[in-house]
Amino acid sequence: MDAAHMGADLEKVLITEEEIHAKLDELAAMIAREYDGKDLLLVGVLKGAVMVMADLMRALPMTAPVDWMAVSSYGSGTKSSGVVRILKDLDTDITGRHVLIVEDIIDSGLTLSWIKANLESRNPASVEICTLLRKPEAAKVDVDVK
């Protein structure tokens, strides 16, 4: 559902579609510069990163393979428990590759820091995080984001 169809339920738009696309273009240019000539793998975190990943891939001036992870860190509520389970692991061996985790928004940072540590244990050349948005007021751990 888009903002036009939310009617009275929508108080205000925090970030416009144009601002989102401009930020994704900026991120794509940074990624292209940093990973030029490197064996890059984009890793999306399901399900939230699907749209951001699709838009980011369209904005990239290069092609890069993509893989997906799905994890769960929410118990019965909506707050992160900090206990993470892998629901869908990568299909790709990341040994020696440059891994860029793509996320839509960082909330507490607990799940993302766990994913990063998990991927770092698999001997990649590097693991970095790319996110469109973050909620600094919700942060429970410091997550280093490019």
Each PLM stretch: what is its role?
Residues M1-K146:
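PRPP-associated nucleotide enzymes
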